[in-house]
């Protein structure tokens, strides 16, 4: 209701975190509908591992998806370096900053990934470049690429399923000793507890 009352023609976009700060899964489809009815763009900030068990931002109608790549095999390294990711609908693709990776086939029919829309890059048109990538970011991107290739779709799904089931198990066990879970509805792998202790 709050969103319906506050989103109007003056709203540029609505951004939600899914799962949110407390671990809750938002009513993402409904939020997307409200946002689009107002003519605004819908942006979802997602935990990439959660996508193994919840719908993708595209399935919720998001125009843009963003997130932190740290859960994808990057160690916690005193605050960085990390990498972020950003994806958009094809209609919005040319408005994205940074380097865009596309899927293609080589002359032998093998799947490959390439940097696409190269005319936007520093080495082609420095004065109009929309990216600035340094070697640390490239190293993080390589590490995430290796992690994703190693895990595959089933590995990501298994990691997400284990994270969710273990969080729900912990929530149930904590409830036995007086810590009640405050989350309303479904949560992914984070949750809030309270206790009289």
Regions found by a protein language model. Give the residues of each.
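Conserved PLP-enzyme active-site core in the AAT-like
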Residues: 1-114, 178, 192
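Short, hydrophobic beta-strand segments
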Residues: 16-17, 146-149, 189-194
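A generic structural motif
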Residues: 20, 151-155, 197
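Active-site C-terminal subdomain of aminotransferase-like
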Residues: 72-177, 181-184
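Conserved PLP-binding catalytic core of the aspartate aminotransferase-like
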Residues: 179-197
């Amino acid at each position: 209701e709050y969103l319906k009352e506050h989103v109007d023609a003056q709203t540029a976009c609505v951004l939600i975190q899914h799962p949110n700060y407390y671990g809750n899964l938002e009513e993402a489809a409904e939020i997307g509908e409200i946002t689009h009815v107002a003519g605004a763009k819908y942006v979802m900030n997602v935990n990439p591992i959660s996508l193994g068990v919840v719908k993708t931002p595209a399935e919720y109608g998001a125009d843009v998806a963003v997130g932190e790549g740290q859960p994808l095999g990057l160690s916690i390294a005193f605050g960085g370096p990390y990498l972020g990711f950003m994806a958009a609908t094809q209609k919005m693709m040319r408005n994205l900053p940074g380097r865009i990776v596309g899927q293609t086939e080589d002359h032998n029919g093998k799947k490959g990934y390439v940097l696409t829309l190269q005319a936007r890059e520093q080495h082609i048109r420095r004065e109009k470049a929309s990216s600035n990538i340094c070697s640390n970011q490239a190293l993080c991107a390589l590490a995430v690429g290796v992690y994703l290739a190693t895990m595959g779709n089933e590995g990501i799904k298994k990691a997400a399923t284990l994270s969710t089931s273990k969080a729900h198990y912990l929530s149930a066990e904590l409830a036995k000793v007086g810590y009640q879970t405050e989350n309303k509805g479904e949560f992914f792998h984070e949750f809030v507890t309270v206790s009289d202790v």
